[in-house]
Design a protein with these regions (language model features):
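Basic, flexible Lys/Arg- and Gly-enriched helix-loop patches that mediate nucleic-acid binding at interfaces
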Residues: 2-191
Length: 191
């Protein structure tokens, strides 16, 4: 892929386009050993060697991060008042976003990327990608609950969830631990 050198360097997190142009004016940027002059030079991301301050800057089109989202962090790209999952990734170079959502008080594995096609293929209902959750509950779950979830639970008067799979892995008098596999992801469906 061919890009202008200013876009290439801005995409890789070296600074804004205006910052990059200042670096170029100072002679800090080289393409295949030759100093860039204008910021408009084209770079082939597959074969050209770009140096900034004599350090290589490799072009990475897509970024992928798996994070363990802690409780108290929201599944968003930005928020003025609350830390986000994107805030947790200091080394991200491009506009990354969470694939899916976990509630603020929920913790768990979350994919962060800038690969829109992958996100679409994982989230689009027509793609039928299951989502599996580990859940700890107050109260005892039993085989009746397993059957109810398998038939599709009525979440509220306007919505009945698609059939899902509930696997109880441990239960006591006042708690249960289980896995639930959903075929769709609706607001607070697991709660």
């Amino acid at each position: 892929m061919k890009l202008r050198i200013d876009k290439y360097l801005a995409d890789m997190g070296t600074g804004s386009r205006s910052d990059v142009k200042a670096f170029i004016r100072k002679g800090m940027v080289k393409i295949n050993g030759t100093a860039a002059r204008t910021g408009k030079e084209k770079v082939d991301t597959d074969c050209d060697i770009v140096l900034m301050n004599d350090e290589p800057v490799e072009y990475v089109q897509y970024e992928y991060y798996l994070i363990n989202k802690p409780a108290g962090v929201i599944s968003a790209t930005e928020d003025r008042n609350t830390p986000t999952v994107v805030d947790m990734i200091k080394e991200a170079k491009k506009d990354v976003f969470p694939v899916g959502r976990l509630d603020k008080d929920t913790e768990g594995l979350l994919l962060i990327t800038n690969d829109g096609l992958l996100a679409h293929n994982l989230l689009a209902p027509k793609k039928h990608v299951d989502k599996k959750y580990y859940v700890e509950t107050d109260g005892l779950l039993n085989e009746d609950n397993v059957r109810q979830v398998l038939q599709g639970l009525k979440v509220d008067e306007d919505f009945t969830a698609l059939p899902a799979f509930l696997e109880i892995i441990e239960s006591g008098n006042d708690y249960s631990k289980c896995y639930i596999t959903l075929h769709e992801g609706k607001f607070h469906q697991i709660k």
